[in-house]
Amino acid sequence: QRNTAPLFNLSELKYLTAADSNIKTLIRQIDNPLFNEHPLEMGVRGHENEILERFKRDKFYELQFNKLKMPINWQNIKLTITKFVNSLKSYQSPYDQYLKGTYTMTDQQKRGMNLFYSDSLACSKCHSGINFSEPTFLNKNNKVEYYYNTGLYNVNEKNEYPQYDTGLSQVTHN
């Protein structure tokens, strides 16, 4: 239902979801897949105690949380997931190394980079930021603008946009 954030380099993102700009931390974002009913992802809602008891009975998790001197509860489960995900970094591609000055790109890689940044393909106009996934684009004046939800749901009465899912306006009520 919502654009899923990548796991790698997640700590570098300014926005975790285009659907709700109020979510600014991963620990808050984790509530969505765990506890939301629409869309249903992990299906925890209504089963919180049962699932928590499974964690507590599992010897592996008991040992890990004891090492951290943390009780097993939902807040600490979310905190440990956050710490793990924020540790995932992937800045070792040839392009990343080229930007650091530690790699010389091949002619083929240079052609690909030039095409990506070209005006004719305009890939970089939408795929920007450190992870090429910021919800931004360059306007006609080459200034960065952020995407936003237009709220154009069912305007042509052909149900091209689902009426039940109004994205950001569902959160902001605007």
Could you say what each language-model-derived stretch is?
Residues 1-174:
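Periplasmic c-type cytochrome electron-transfer domains
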